[in-house]
Amino acid sequence: TQVGSSAASDVYKRQQVDEVIVPPRDAKTFNVKSGNFFRIESIEGPQVGDLNIFQADNLNEKFYSGKTRALYGTHISVGDKMFSSFPYLRSLATITWDTLDWYGYDKDGGSVHDVIGTRCDPYTYKLTSNNDYHYCCHSNLTRALVKERNIKLDEAEKIVHDVLNVFMLTGFTNDTKQYFMKSSPVRPGDYLEFFAETDLLGALSACPGGDCGSEHSSDVAKCYPLKVSIWDVDKKFLEGIKNSKISSYNRDHGLTD
C-alpha cells in the first residue's frame, strides 16, 4: 500500500489539517509543510485545474514544467517528481496517488495530468480573438497571489509559471503533432495527491474551460470547484526522509577555467 492512498490513511495515522475550496474560474493559494501531503480533488463535477507550486520561503524557486517533462515525459503520475527551476533544480513534490492512473494513454495518444500545456492566458486570447478576458488561469493565479499573498501585480505575474494541468486530458495529434484537448475523465471523488519535499506555497486555478472538452477561456463551459486538502502524517513513518536539497553545482559556468 502506498503512503498516499486512502487505504493507507489509518496505517500511517494521517490527519487532515487544512482545506481550501477553489471556486470555478478563480484561484486560491495554500501552504504545505515539508513532510505533509496535499490532495487536489474533484468534488462536484468534471473540472481541470492549473497548478503552480513555489518554495514557500523563496518564490523565485518554482515548478519547472519543461525539466519535469524532459525527465518523465508529457504526462506525470505516481512516483514522478515536480522539479524546481534553475539554479535550484530539486524535487518540490512527488506524486503519491492518482485515481486516474487507469486511463493510461488512449488511441489518440491522450493522457491526463500534462506538463506540455502552458496555461490559458489573456494575452493569447487577445491575440487570437481581439477580446479581453480576465478569468484565464494565468490571470486567476496572478490575482490569487496579489490578493492572498499581498504581492504587487507586476511581481505576481512574473512568477506565475507553466503549470501542471491536473486532470486535463491532452496530447499531440498523430498527423500534425499539434496540442489537443479532450473532455477530462475526472469525476467527483477523483484526486491527485502529492508529498511535499520542502515547505511549499501552492496556487491552483479552476480552469474556465471546465473539463476542457469544448470552449476555452470564456464563460461558456460549465465549471465546478476543486478542493485542496492538506494532510499530516505520523512523523515516525517519515524517519530518514529529509527535505530535498538544492543543486550542489557551484555555478561557476566555466568563468574561472
What annotation goes with each model-predicted range?
Residues 1-8, 12:
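Single conserved hydrophobic/aromatic residue that forms the stacking wall/gate
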Residues 69-170:
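Low-complexity, serine/threonine/proline-enriched polar segments
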